[in-house]
Every structure is written in structure tokens, then in C-alpha cells.
């Protein structure tokens, strides 16, 4: 076995610190190795809102951030989306009750497009017409608040669901007039579009290495 000719690529790798966006105080999300900083561009980091805030009540909120640039030994990210743990959602589901789901594409006032999934859990099983009415309330609130908010403001309205004025809070406040609710959550979000020089662009992060002509 020839060992002399084997290149130890691991030793050539450098460790980079990955940080959250300014909205989350550029909290360190972790470290990752790479032999070329450009290879980090587009990489997705997964964490929980608990890891970012230190608040255990958010341990069920998964957060996704994507590396958009590297400066020195620090990789900077932007929000890519969030999702509640499946076990948490499963725990909210009850027999003889209804789950109402609404999926909406919305735009923020600073030009970002997102897909937002809202869920409401009723105390008892409700009628189809009541589900439709609740879903309509969801849509009106999610779309309106998105139009009135920047991306950073909307992120906070989505993920901090227990805060007064959050999307979940506002939906619960209005929809419970239609039928008694047990819980409302913004179960998922995904960044789809970002502002560009010539209008909205797909939220796709391309590494410079992919742009090089081989």
C-alpha cells in the first residue's frame, strides 16, 4: 500500500465559524471545515430556536440558515426557513378534533417572497364550512401582516408564536370566534424569493465554484 502519494486533504481544511443573521445577534451556529471558502457558499445549517435564544420553550422550532458569504474565518448566513418538529405537531393532534392547515405564498414590504404554513387545532371536531372559514382568516392575517412587515419582522411574527401580536396569536384571536381552538401554530416557512436588481429572484444561493467554467 503506497502511503507517500496519498494526499491528506483533511489537513488542508480550515475551520470556519458559521453565524446567524443580525436578527439573531449573529449567534454562532457552529463550525465547519472546508479547504476552500467558496465551498461553504450555499451550505445549509440546521439548529433550533432554543439553541439560538437559550429559551427551552423553543426547543421544538427547527431553524434553517444558508451561507451566503464568507469573510475571513466567518461564514455569514441568511434565513432559509423554519419548521416545527413532527413529534411536536403529532402531540397537538387529538382524536375527535380537527386540524386546519393553510399554505400561503406571501410577500413582505421589502420584497421577499415566502411560503407560510399555518395550522389550527380545534377543541372538538368542526364542520367543513368552519374549517374553510378558519382557513380564510389565516390567509387574511398572514398576507396582511406580511405586506406590512419587513422580512426580519415577519420571521419574528412566525417563530415567536407565544408572543402577543405574533401570527399565531392573531389567528387564534380571530378564528376562535368561528370555532373554539386549542392551539394555533405557524408550522413551517420557506424563503422562495429575494429582491434583485431587476426584480424578485429565486432564493437560490450558488457557489462561485459552480460558476467557474471547467
Swiss-Prot record:
It holds the Pfam family Ribosomal_S3Ae. GO terms for cellular component: ribonucleoprotein complex; ribosome. Coiled coil: none annotated. SMART domains: Ribosomal_S3Ae. The keyword Disulfide bond does not apply. One of its GO terms (biological process) is translation. It comes from the Archaea. Keywords: Ribonucleoprotein, Ribosomal protein. GO terms for molecular function: structural constituent of ribosome. InterPro entries: Ribosomal_eS1, Ribosomal_eS1_arc, Ribosomal_eS1_CS. Belongs to the eukaryotic ribosomal protein eS1 family. This is Small ribosomal subunit protein eS1.
